[in-house]
Amino acid sequence: MFRGANAINLDAKGRLAMPSRYRDELDSRSAGQLIVTIDAVDPCLCLYPLSEWELIEAKLRDLATFREENRRLQRLLIGNAVDLELDGSGRFLVPPRLREYAKLDKRVMLVGQLNKFQLWDEDAWNALADADLAAIQKPGAMPDELRDLIL
């Protein structure tokens, strides 16, 4: 499981270094093979170990193709998916088109989301984190299904 938020630098060639604390798990789960695609809701990228992505692809494949919203989601996620591999130094190249979509430039946040990571522009992530915290603290903002969650 991937958790935590990590500030990392995007180099001039568009490469990011995966923090070492995640590398062993990525190696064991998918031999360092990753898939990056756009997030269909937020202005960020989703980075999956190949084994996790294959589960998502199977679910997308099984969607009814006569529904336009299903085809749209398939086009967005699968059409923008790119295979990546960690190099010997634990780096991977984020394709220019995807960097542009997420507005990634120099400082990037790699955010663990249990089965995947999100890649955010650092300023966008900080603004969202502040907004999320303010929103969840408002009275009545907690969804019913979370009210009984024990932390």
From Swiss-Prot:
InterPro entries: MraZ, MraZ_C, MraZ_dom, MraZ_N, MraZ_sf, SpoVT-AbrB_dom, SpoVT-AbrB_sf. Keywords: Cytoplasm, DNA-binding, Repeat, Transcription, Transcription regulation. SUPFAM superfamilies: AbrB/MazE/MraZ-like. Coiled coil: none annotated. The keyword Transit peptide does not apply. One of its GO terms (molecular function) is transcription cis-regulatory region binding. Gene3D superfamilies: Transcriptional regulator MraZ domain. Pfam families: MraZ. One of its GO terms (biological process) is negative regulation of DNA-templated transcription initiation. One of its GO terms (cellular component) is nucleoid. It is found in: Cytoplasm, Nucleoid. The keyword Nucleus does not apply. Its main location: cytoplasm. It comes from the Bacteria. Residues 5-52, 81-124 form the SpoVT-AbrB domain. Forms oligomers. Belongs to the MraZ family. This is Transcriptional regulator MraZ. It comes from Pseudomonas syringae pv. syringae (strain B728a). The lineage of its organism: Bacteria, Pseudomonadati, Pseudomonadota, Gammaproteobacteria, Pseudomonadales.
